[in-house]
């Protein structure tokens, strides 16, 4: 999927993936507004993150990726209605531990993977 998106967007030019995220049903949020896959659990989110990053790293044209966003949106929705589990933390600033742990693990390997080690 990443390879197809990158090829369509950039040809041979470098590309920065500006926003991506995955939502999960077990967050307790409605998740009725907002883009991206709606998965079952936070573990599924963590595994999807790892697959996505590894796919991005496999393409030398991808020079960076950016997770959307720090905190979940409110259950009632923000001004445009988005009410989804996009965050690394919930609205009480409590981290989704399994996701944060996986991100820490994966992000710690990015440079080595990109350098072929």
State the predicted function of each range.
Residues 1-34, 50-54:
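Glycoside hydrolase catalytic-domain groove-lining segments
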Residues 5-6, 16, 29, 37-39, ...:
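Generic detector of leucine side chains in alpha-helical contexts
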Residues 8, 68-117:
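Aromatic-rich peripheral "rim/lid" segments of glycoside hydrolase catalytic domains that contact
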Residues 26-36, 77-85:
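Histidine/acidic-residue-rich catalytic or RNA/ligand-binding cores of hydrolases
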Residues 31-45, 94:
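The substrate-binding groove and active-site-proximal loops of carbohydrate-active enzymes
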Residues 42, 48-84:
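Long, C-terminal catalytic modules of enzymes
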Residues 43-50, 54, 63, 102-117:
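Metal-dependent phosphoesterase/phosphodiesterase active-site architecture
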């Amino acid at each position: 999927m990443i390879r197809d998106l990158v090829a369509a967007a950039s040809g041979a030019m470098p590309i920065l993936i500006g926003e991506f995220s995955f939502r999960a049903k077990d967050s307790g949020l409605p998740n009725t507004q907002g883009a991206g896959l709606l998965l079952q659990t936070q573990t599924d989110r963590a595994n999807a993150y790892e697959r996505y990053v590894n796919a991005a790293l496999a393409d030398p044209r991808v020079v960076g990726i950016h997770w959307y966003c720090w905190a979940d949106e409110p259950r009632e929705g923000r001004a445009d209605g988005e009410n989804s589990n996009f965050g690394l933390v919930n609205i009480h600033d409590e981290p989704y531990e399994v996701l944060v742990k996986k991100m820490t693990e994966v992000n710690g390997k990015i440079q080595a993977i990109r350098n072929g080690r």
